[in-house]
């Protein structure tokens, strides 16, 4: 009797539970699962910069008890916030199960690969321990989510805003993001096909092979939104440089990662006996995208597409 009433008096518990559907990670093939949040998470483990960026965007960074797998340059506008956060791990590695359990989080927000067999395993393991999970849509197996899209991270922001009960507070910011994406969609639609450059994404270069992204990756959607035509096809991964010569794109997107700096890749392209003949390399139509902007999705993604759109407008 009494304890129930006093609990009801506590407004944070009096609110109806927030029920959401979200994915498992790679260990569970990204299947959709339902979770019920009875209260606002207080101890969040945020894994990867894009996730941290998204939580700061929503203004809930005070709930983050630790961050992990954050190894690129901090996002400049959030520099101050990053400085206050505790790092559970340094560098590119994911934390161990023991390290995560030791932190006693009530919510883990991350990528699908964190919940893979070689890392934390299925989200089910955590949910059975009473620890909630949220896996970002653009990071789950593509067979679960379909091709990745810029707007999916905005859906994630809306779901997370619900979980943290900050929907009202975050509404204007989320609407602002949606408008920016709409503007890009309209500009892209209005651009005649003849004016759209054909674009290939290059992530790594290994002598006579290169590593590319696929048609279902977020980069393909970013290219389309920016007014280009993506030539990235169904199969990503390593391909022969001869294949790239056959495609001969008007423009290359080169991914900048912390471990493989972009300046080295661009230098290698110009010095390469085969790839230096590419139209995009000869004409120096190379656009750089940070790994952090194209994987998962955050404010940086929208900024990268806007910059790419301007680059295409100015150069083609």
Question: PLM features: what roles do these ranges have?
Answer:
Residues 2-53, 162-202, 310-316:
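Bacterial Sec-exported substrate-binding components of ABC uptake systems
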Residues 70-77, 92, 210-238:
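Alpha-helical, coiled-coil/dimerization segments enriched in small aliphatic residues
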Residues 96-110, 241-257:
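Proline-aspartate-enriched helix->loop->beta-strand connector
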Residues 51-54, 60, 96, 119-122, ...:
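Stable alpha-helical elements in mature extracytoplasmic
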Residues 147-162, 171, 254-316:
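Structured C-terminal subdomain patch of bacterial secreted/periplasmic proteins
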Residues 75, 112-121, 131-159, 192-218, ...:
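Extracytoplasmic ligand-binding site segments that recognize negatively charged/polar headgroups
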Residues 25-31, 86-98, 234-242:
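Short helix-initiation/N-cap motifs at beta->coil->alpha
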Residues 45-103, 107-115, 231:
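A short, structured surface patch at a secondary-structure boundary
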